[in-house]
């Protein structure tokens, strides 16, 4: 059984064709600059690149070219489109309606449209991608897998904001959380590595990329997470501010005479470690600058590590203890220095790190010592595989 996994952005599209017998990706691809000049599709099969450069006026044209690349006689991996048993779509926001992945039909599409106000940047391209696939592959079942779904198990006291209740009732303003597919995947792998049932464990998962969030997992369910109503909340990130005093936004509008759009640009695109360091949103650049004595770069890293450490501490209280901590995503998987700094100060939990193991980059490994009371893992995330597994399970029903 082969499943196509699609992740649509506003002008880009990532895809993988996964053979579910071996759970291996037969092809991985990226389409860039959809709807703008210089459109390009890059597909990798067995390490070899295949590139298509031609105008793609919209996502439908992009998906046409994806299918063309997959069945290409020389560079493709399937002989016919009928080999694609189903398509799994990453959808950022499922609102309160969806606590798990769902088979897509017209009713689901209407619900996704209703969620656009909650995710105006992300849901529209997700919807466009689904519509394009449904048009081109009308007989192929499609499944929506939501970033928010895993966090629908948060208790009401964890997701409710202390605002007038009617803002929740009438406008859906509450904590939703994101990166759910990643948190679900790595917590499951951690339990496998420990040889225990996830339902018997207390796990804190740290998805640390340009966007970053933590999740507290208890009895196999998400009970707390750091992102909120939007992916702007929580930790300091690459370009996002994370949690700040909300009155700062009023100050920016009233005293600094900034428009809502200008404020939005500051807190979403000019803040985080980029804002503090003035160097970059790329942690590799900031780490390099800090080593060369750039004080603002060092401060940016210190603030970032502090917000992660602080949140881990809070989540041990939420869970009443912790059995395992997992690092994943770009920084979590690849920066030994960041992992060390984040865990520095959590010795009271009985955490002991093996310095040599911690030097490993981007591979699945336990980095805690044998006598560490809390297991610490680095687990590369695989959201595409999780989407494919859900798609297989739902279409088999």
From Swiss-Prot:
UniProt GO cellular component terms = cytoplasm
Pfam family of this protein, just one? Answer: Acetate_kinase
Q: What is its main location?
A: cytoplasm
Site positions for Transition state stabilizer = 179, 240
Q: Where is the chain membrane-spanning? A: none
GO biological process: one example? acetyl-CoA biosynthetic process
Q: What does the entry comment about cofactor binding?
A: Mg(2+). Can also accept Mn(2+).
What residues form the catalytic site here?
147 (proton donor/acceptor)
Molecular function (Gene Ontology), one example: acetate kinase activity
Q: Which annotated residues bind Mg(2+)? A: 7, 383
Instruction: Name the positions where substrate binds.
Output: 90
Keywords (alphabetical) are: ATP-binding, Cytoplasm, Kinase, Magnesium, Metal-binding, Nucleotide-binding, Transferase
Cofactor (UniProt): Mg(2+); Mn(2+)
Could you tell me what reaction this enzyme catalyses? Answer: acetate + ATP = acetyl phosphate + ADP
Q: What does this protein do?
A: Catalyzes the formation of acetyl phosphate from acetate and ATP. Can also catalyze the reverse reaction.
* Family label: Belongs to the acetokinase family.
Query: Protein name, please?
Result: Acetate kinase
């Amino acid at each position: 059984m082969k499943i196509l996994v699609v992740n649509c952005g506003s002008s880009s599209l990532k895809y993988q064709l996964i053979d579910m017998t071996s759970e291996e990706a037969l092809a991985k691809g990226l389409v860039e600059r959809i709807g703008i000049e210089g459109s390009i599709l890059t597909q990798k099969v067995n390490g070899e690149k295949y590139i298509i450069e031609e105008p793609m006026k919209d996502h439908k044209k992009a998906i046409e070219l994806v299918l063309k690349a997959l069945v290409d006689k020389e560079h493709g991996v399937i002989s016919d489109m009928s080999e694609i048993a189903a398509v799994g779509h990453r959808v950022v926001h499922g609102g309160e309606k969806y606590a798990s992945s769902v088979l897509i039909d017209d009713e689901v599409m209407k619900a996704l449209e209703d969620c656009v106000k909650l995710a105006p940047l992300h849901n529209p391209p997700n919807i466009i991608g689904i519509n394009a696939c449904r048009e081109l592959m009308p007989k192929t079942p499609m499944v929506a897998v939501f970033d928010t779904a895993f966090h629908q198990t948060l208790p009401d006291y964890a997701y409710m904001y202390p605002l007038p209740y009617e803002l929740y009732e009438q406008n859906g303003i509450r904590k939703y959380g994101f990166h759910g597919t990643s948190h679900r995947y790595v917590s499951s792998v951690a339990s496998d590595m420990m040889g225990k049932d996830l339902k018997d464990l207390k796990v804190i998962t740290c998805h640390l990329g340009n966007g970053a969030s933590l999740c507290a997992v208890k009895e196999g369910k998400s009970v707390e997470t750091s992102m909120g109503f939007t992916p702007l909340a929580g930790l300091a990130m690459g370009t996002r501010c994370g949690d700040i005093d909300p009155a700062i936004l009023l100050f920016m509008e009233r005293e600094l005479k900034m428009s809502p759009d200008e404020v939005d640009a500051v807190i979403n695109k000019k803040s985080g470690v980029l804002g503090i360091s003035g160097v970059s949103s790329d942690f590799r650049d900031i780490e390099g600058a800090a080593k060369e004595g750039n004080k603002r770069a060092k401060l940016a890293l210190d603030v970032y590590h502090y917000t992660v450490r602080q949140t881990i501490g809070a989540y041990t209280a939420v869970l009443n203890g912790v059995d395992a901590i997992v690092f994943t995503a770009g920084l979590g998987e690849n920066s030994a220095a960041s992992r060390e700094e984040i865990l520095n100060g959590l010795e009271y939990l009985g955490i002991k790190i093996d310095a040599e193991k911690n030097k490993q980059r981007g591979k699945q490994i336990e980095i805690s010592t044998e006598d560490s009371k809390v297991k610490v893992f680095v687990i590369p995330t695989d959201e595409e595989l999780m989407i494919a597994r859900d798609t297989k399970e739902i279409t088999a029903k």
